[in-house]
């Protein structure tokens, strides 16, 4: 079964998903895929007291952290170094994405697809699919899209994607 977690920007989708992942891990459920927590700093002028600076990707199950995207307006020089190849100019995204990070995360999904299924059925997690993957195709986490499109597998009868 495919579960889709959706909601407005910065409403806590990934925080909720992290809580679910923690509970499933406590129960021994195999989890594979990627979680995309925000990179935050304290900012008392913001309604929630924090300001989002970027997005990391945490590979499941290993926990490797990959710096994935950073806000363009905060560090234009750093952001320009993270420009995703093939990004259409008209997309005007607030985030600069790292080619290396996208390649690393896509390679992770390729390895999951080619690897052996866990001994116990688990959950495939994709946090998150957005405009790059859904509006333009061929950009972003394309290998995650391919894997989810294959449908249930013995190792992951269920998948949860964040959109």
Specify the residue positions occupied by each region the protein language model found.
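The conserved Walker
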Residues: 9
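Conserved lysine of the Walker
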Residues: 13
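Hydrophobic positions on the alpha1 helix immediately C-terminal to the Walker A/P-loop
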Residues: 16, 20
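Phosphate-binding/switch loop-helix module in NTP-utilizing enzymes
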Residues: 75-136, 142
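Loop/turn-to-beta-strand initiation segments
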Residues: 120-123, 151-162
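Short, conserved "post-DEAD/DEAH" coupling segment immediately C-terminal to helicase motif II
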Residues: 137-151
């Amino acid at each position: 079964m495919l579960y889709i977690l959706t909601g407005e920007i910065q409403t806590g989708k990934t925080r909720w998903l992290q809580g679910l992942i923690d509970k499933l891990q406590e129960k021994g459920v195999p989890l594979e895929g990627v979680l995309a927590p925000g990179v935050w700093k304290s900012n008392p002028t913001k309604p929630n007291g924090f300001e989002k600076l970027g997005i990391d990707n945490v590979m499941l199950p290993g926990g490797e952290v990959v710096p994935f995207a950073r806000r363009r307006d905060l560090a234009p020089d750093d952001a320009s170094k993270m420009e995703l190849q093939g990004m259409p100019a008209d997309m005007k995204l607030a985030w600069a994405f790292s080619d290396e990070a996208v390649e690393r995360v896509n390679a992770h999904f390729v390895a999951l697809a080619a690897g052996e299924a866990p001994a116990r059925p688990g959950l495939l997690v994709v946090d998150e699919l957005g405009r790059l993957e859904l509006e333009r195709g061929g950009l972003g986490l394309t290998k995650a899209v391919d894997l989810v499109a294959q449908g249930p597998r013995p190792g992951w009868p269920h998948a949860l994607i964040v959109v």
